[in-house]
């Protein structure tokens, strides 16, 4: 096929090619991007020129045996962050995003300074009992002292996860300073760009019967 024949073929297929780039590829590329970014959660790292592993969540090394201790970093029983990755196709383009309020904080890292409220303390106590495996004791109105040498004074040390929640429940601070490490899951990715380029080229070849 010489250049004139190729130019004639392009003109004949112009409508199909335009429909591909305007309508079909934004949907195809969006789906590919969503799958790629969600796979970052499963791999626990960001893929761009290779896998860049995330810092491990502290709960994974806390010795917890409950369900929460088994989920990977940034994953949970509800998977809000994972499930909120979405794509919105438009003419000749597609927007891929995670619109959860705290998504940018995890994606880029940073600090938050939440106010310590009574609700937060109650939540911390609930998480403490969950992480420690202890049953919440009913209030009796009486305080019992620990006798020296008693079984109570020889209780095993609490695991780091439970201790973290206990400290939060008992803190005297009015505001907290919490640093969130970067765990990028959305952004420019060489591997994703290469896959989309290859898919686009294949779709064009199919239209031109090349």
What does each of the following model-derived ranges do?
Residues 1-210:
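Short, Lys/Arg-rich flexible segments
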């Amino acid at each position: 096929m010489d250049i004139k024949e190729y130019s004639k073929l392009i003109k004949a297929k112009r409508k199909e090619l335009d429909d591909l780039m305007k309508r079909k590829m934004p949907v195809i590329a969006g789906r590919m991007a969503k799958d790629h970014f969600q796979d970052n959660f499963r791999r626990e790292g960001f893929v761009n020129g290779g896998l860049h592993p995330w810092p491990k969540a502290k709960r994974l090394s806390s010795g917890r045996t409950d369900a929460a201790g088994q989920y990977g970093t940034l994953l949970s029983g509800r998977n809000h962050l994972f499930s909120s990755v979405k794509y919105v196709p438009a003419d000749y383009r597609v927007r891929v995003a995670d619109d959860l309020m705290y998504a940018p904080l995890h994606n880029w890292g940073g600090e938050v300074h939440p106010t310590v409220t009574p609700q937060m303390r109650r939540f911390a106590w609930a998480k403490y009992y969950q992480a420690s495996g202890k049953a919440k004791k009913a209030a009796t109105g009486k305080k019992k002292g620990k006798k020296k040498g008693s079984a109570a004074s020889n209780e095993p040390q609490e695991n780091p996860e439970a201790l973290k929640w206990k400290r939060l429940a008992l803190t005297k601070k009015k505001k907290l300073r919490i640093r969130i490490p970067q765990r990028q899951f959305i952004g420019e990715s060489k591997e994703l760009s290469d896959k989309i380029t290859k898919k686009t080229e294949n779709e064009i070849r199919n239209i031109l019967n090349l």
